[in-house]
Every structure is written in structure tokens, then in C-alpha cells.
């Protein structure tokens, strides 16, 4: 789950990380009132969307008068903000964050992320803040450092100092940087985040350290422990199909292809998409119905896939372990009738009650194309949608 910058800064502030004063706004009038309350003399008007690169896309602008705030807020609110993370369609700006202008002397990058290989928390930092870390990694990889923190020990002073030294933090700011990094680690762990990113972390002319941006991703599996974080969720920023799928406990991610995929198990789902690609097709989605699928869940899965006008065919690939093939067959038959299916459907089933499931499909009278292997299934659905 992602949240907005202003919400992330509220979390950082609660953990003692210095951030500028700011007020969210949902209308131009609220933006003006926020600027008046902050007092100026300089404000930053920031679009709030769940994507990076807002500045380059025209979503972050400096205002030096209240009239500037009013004009800029009017320009940004409601715009389709396009960045390298939104795709060509962009995202509509529905919220703004009006923030005190900052005295920027030097910008740094710092983030905490789970490193599955080392089973530790990786602190990634760079002296090249204020720009995409991907660009830095490509053009100046030597300017990125990584320090791995053992969650059983926590971030030590020595590790925090290693990060500070690695990004060339001046001596008079090292102590505060160590403090900020350790608070950032505490924040990361206690909120069950999967990513916390500050870009930029600013050092002003007085040597003071402050987070000028905040990006959070949270582990969805831990949200039951954090109702205060769930309250930050903004459904307007999420794919409507993915929101609908979550209501039925379906793991769904939209893609750009034209072949809908319904699979049980994340690994098999990814292998299915790879196989479709191998045989010249393009998957329209990732969809894992899980091990407890019912006829209702399968029907809803079909409805969600078919809401995408690009879907020209569907491939169902089931391995019957916990999930019995006859249960899926019943769900597929029910779904086909419920949605009045009009696109080609290929079904491949293996495992528990496989023969019964296949017989149910064959006896249904529906134009279902059967397949025994993944390669055969992929070949048939790719041919059917061309």
C-alpha cells in the first residue's frame, strides 16, 4: 500500500524526523488559506499523487506571493500529471500540499528497503539527491552506497556514521544525520514498511538536516496491525480493477496485454504469463485466485478481467492441490453463464479431481477450449485472439 507525501511526512514527524511545515489542500481556496496560515515568505505547491517524478512533470512549483499560490494551485489541481511512473495516461491531481520553502544547500538521497537475499534492511544512500535514484545508478553507480542492518541488532551508531561518511556529509551535520537515520530505521520497522525513501534529504546553510520528501510503501500483509495507516489509503490513486479484486481476496494486477489470465498460485501465475509471452502473446493481467476459490470468486474474477476492453481471450491455468479442479470447473461454468462470455476461453487443469473437472467442462455445452499442457494452452489462446 502506498500513501501520499504529506501523510508520509506526518509519520516521519511522529518519529522525530525533521520535516518542513505543511498543510494539505483539496481546493484552490484551501491552498490559499494554507499559505496564509504558514506565513511564507516562500511556499512550495506540490501535487499529491502516488508516483515519483512530480517536479519534472510540472507538479511541484515554488510560489513567492499568495497570488502565485492561487495561480499555481489552479494550474495543478485537476491536471493529468504525467511522469515516468504514471505512464502516458498520467494521474489526475486531486490533492495539494502547501509547504514552507526550504533553504537548500545540499541534497542527499536515503532509503530503507527489505533486502530478501541478505534478510536484512538495506539502507541505500547517495550524495546525488533530488533526482531519480535509477538515473544515479545508471550514470554514477559509484555514488550509491548500501549498508545492511540486522533487524535483531538494529541500526548501530557505527552503521549510521558509515552512511553519513559514504555520502560525504560534513562533520558538523554527522551527529544529526546519525539521529535521523536511526529514527528512520525505527519508523521503517515499527510501521511494517517495505520501503521508506527520503529524496531529497536536505542540508541547509546552517548545517541542519531535514526531509523534503517522503515516500512510503507498506506490507499489505501487516496492515491489520496498523489501522492508522489503513486510514491513509486513497482509493482514487489505485487501479479500480485492483480495488474491486481486493474486495474478493483476489490478487490482481493490471497489465498492458490482451489475454486475461486466471491462475491459482503466484508462481504458476508468473510462469503462465511467461509462457504466453514465449508463444507470442501479451498477458492483460496477473490474477491469483488463491487456494480457497469459490464459484463466486471465479465469477468475480471473470467480471473484473472482462471490464478491460483490451481483453480478447482468457486462459485459465489451474493446478489442483488444495484447490480441486472440479471446484474451478464449477466456477468457470458459472462465470461463463453469468457474464455471457463472448471471448475465447482456454482451460488447462491438472491435479486433484482433474478428470471430474474436465468432464464437467466438456458436458457444459460451452465453447471452452481444453488443453493438457501449459505450452498447448498458451499456443491455443494466442492463436484464438489473433
Curated annotation (Swiss-Prot):
Cellular component terms (Gene Ontology): cytosol; succinate-CoA ligase complex
Pathway noted in the entry: Carbohydrate metabolism; tricarboxylic acid cycle; succinate from succinyl-CoA (ligase route): step 1/1
Residues that hold substrate according to the record: 264, 321-323
Coiled coil (UniProt feature): none
Record key words, sorted: ATP-binding, Ligase, Magnesium, Metal-binding, Nucleotide-binding, Tricarboxylic acid cycle
Co-factor note (free text): Binds 1 Mg(2+) ion per subunit.
UniProt-listed PROSITE patterns: ATP_GRASP (PS50975), SUCCINYL_COA_LIG_3 (PS01217)
Full protein name: Succinate--CoA ligase [ADP-forming] subunit beta
Species annotation: Polaromonas sp. (strain JS666 / ATCC BAA-500)
